[in-house]
Amino acid sequence: MAKTVMTMPPRMSTEEWQTRLDLAACYRLVDLFGWSDLVNTRVTARVPGQHDQFLINPYGLLYDEVTASSLVKIDAEGNKVDPSESDINSGGFAIPSTIHMARPEVACVLHTHSIAGCAVSMQRDGLLPLNQHALQIIGDIACHDYEGAGRSAEGRARLLADLDDRHILVLRNHGLLIVGTSIAAAFIATYRMERACAMQLAFQQSGAAFHPITDEVVSAASNRPTGGRNEPAKFEWPALLRRLDRIDPSYKQ
């Protein structure tokens, strides 16, 4: 694969190009961490300065094929804003669009079908307060019951009500949906949730007795939402981009 880094296209704002770079990097990182599902699921980002314009992956590309220039700009209904030969999964954009339009602070919506996330979504009690990783996010998690593959307006309204003002939504029997005030925030919240889910599964498989955390500590964590904060942009996100650049910087094309 060619690794030439592309410069910003003419007539595109610096802010949009930076968002494209971050979103393409996010797709590559989701794949690198093992959370992708062939060409299914998606990560969407709001175009800076545009309330109703968004970037999404071209339908049919694997996550490790997505580049900054291949991302498709669409409106809230899934219509292409700029000419593009690429198709998108317009049906799959219905839920992200609903969230983006209802919550203007949400810059990124990240949806996964990961093994750990799906496995925990199938458990009656969802993510349990078993360890420090879970407690970091436990107060920022909501759940939404599976309603089939349909995307009716009523179903989207119920999903939005369940998410409320939180940033992590367990889609029961389906997967995870994470929102963030930046692409970096959404990715790091996903990392924390995926890590906590994997730890829960590993513990459950061990068959060992659980050493409980006190109710006071769990209660304090439950009342301290942290999942969508922007701090990850300061340290973790640049570090992840450096790692990606060492592996394959072609996402910048």
List each language-model region with its residue ranges:
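Glycine-rich flexible loops
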Residues: 1-253
